[in-house]
Structure formats: structure tokens, C-alpha cells
Amino acid sequence: KIIQITDTHLMPRGTDLHGLDPCKRLETCIESINEYHADADLCIITGDLTHQGDREAYRDLRGILKQLSIPYHLLVGNHDHRQIFSEIFPETPRDEHGFFQQTLETSAGIFLLLDTVEHGMPWGSYCETRALWLKSQLELHKNQPVYLFMHHPPFNIGIPALDKISLREDAKRIHQTVKDFSNIKHLFFGHVHRPVSGSWHGIPFTTLRGTNHQVQLDLKADDYLPFTHEPPAYCVALLEPQQTIVHFHDYLDDSLYVKQLLSRV
């Protein structure tokens, strides 16, 4: 059982973003996880940890994550600043070339955490150097279940403005790297601020809303990002050898909750 959070977009505490308080919304998210999912094995936050890469915002993130009762692992996104992030979270592993890529060995299988950031750009990048690391890890673990985690999606999702800031041409490189490995069970990513699921070259994928603002389902948005105040969410993924179940929880939902005995259904 794992938790995915994405696109927290923290600003220095007390600073709003799009009319919302990113710190408070993340704290509420963590309170919900602690209350209902303290038995989860770990939590992965798939990038855009802060909105502007502020040192103070990363410090706030570290302080907030101290409240989380389960282990966590962090990915960077296009809104993050690698150097400042590494100063505040120096324990985050890097690959031999300095990218924030790591391999986690878990009871469910191998988790590969990828770095898709192109510094200073909203779109992603996955260069040959990073792809060689990924291929080496896939070769090393070719007889085990593998789960991929990244910030940018390696394909278009049908919202034109978001598709312009995906992995673009480097998506082909990722596909060429993973196409021969049938043991990849699922792909988790962030960046799009929407609940989206499907299959990419036979690999099931899911993504979800961020903890602050969201992107409206506007399939015609081309030269603007249609931000909304749709509810934030986190995902609960149940990983087993023969199936992957992904639940999405709108943790700010306060609608009526009624327990109905099964005997009376």
C-alpha cells in the first residue's frame, strides 16, 4: 500500500497561490493520510514540490513532512530548483550524474524514481544520460515487478496547453528505453493536475489532482492553462502481484458520511 501526492506547489508560509494556501492544504492532506492510511508502506510526492523554488518554501515543506507518519520520497518537477532542493533535502539520492533518480526495493517490487526536469523550462527532458541509467536499472531488475514514478507524462493527454509542456520529443527516448520490458506494472506521474488514467504502449498509468490548484478539463485550451479550484486529492495504490488498484481521495470533502450495515443494504 503506497500513497502518491503530487504538485504541492508550496509558497513561503502565509503566501497564497491562485487564491489558496498551499501549506495549509498540504497539512490537511497529511492529517488525512495519518488518520486513515498510517499503515501505508511509503508516500511518493511526484514533483513541483514548491512553486518558485524558494529556499523558505522548501524549509516549510520539510517541516510539514515531519508530521507525516510514514516514510516519504521526493521527485523534482519543473517548478523546483535542483540546487536549493538539494540543500534542504541533502539525503535525497542522486544517480552518478547528479540527477535525482533512485531505485527503491519494496515488498511490491522495484520502484524507479525518475528526474524529468529541464532546468528553467516548463516542459520536461529525459536525456540519453538519464535514459542509460533507467535502462541499466530495468536490466538489473528484469525479473521483478517494476513501477515507474516521474513528474512529466511521456505522452500527450489531450489538453493542448499541457501537451506543449510534457516531455515532448524525449518521450520517444523513454518509450525506446522501456519497450522491451514487460515487467513494468504501472506508471505514476504528476504535472497535469487532473485525474487521468489509461494505458501507454501497454503500460497502465494514473495521475491525479495536486494539493493546491487544478487544471480544468478543457480539451481546447491551447495558449493558456485553465486553472480551477477543483478539490485536491491524494492517491492510495494497492499493489499486488496480479493487480494494481488505485483509489483517489478528495481529502477536503466534508459531505455527509453514513455507515450502512451490510445486513440492511
Regions found by a protein language model. Name each.
Residues 15-21, 90-91, 120, 160-166, ...:
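Short glycine-enriched, charge-decorated loop/helix-capping segments at active-site entrances
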Residues 1-12, 108-118, 147-150, 203-209, ...:
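Active-site-proximal beta-strand elements of phosphoester/diester hydrolases
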Residues 11-14, 51-56, 78-85, 119-122, ...:
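Active-site environment of divalent metal-dependent phosphoester hydrolases
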Residues 208-219:
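His/Asp/Glu-enriched short active-site or ligand-binding loop at hydrolase and phosphoryl-transfer sites
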Residues 29-42, 123-206, 228, 236, ...:
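His/acidic metal-ligating clusters that form di-metal
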Residues 1-60, 157-160:
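N-terminal active-site segment of His-dependent metallophosphoesterases
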Residues 55-140, 170-183, 201, 223-239:
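Extended active-site neighborhood of metal-dependent phosphoesterases/phosphodiesterases
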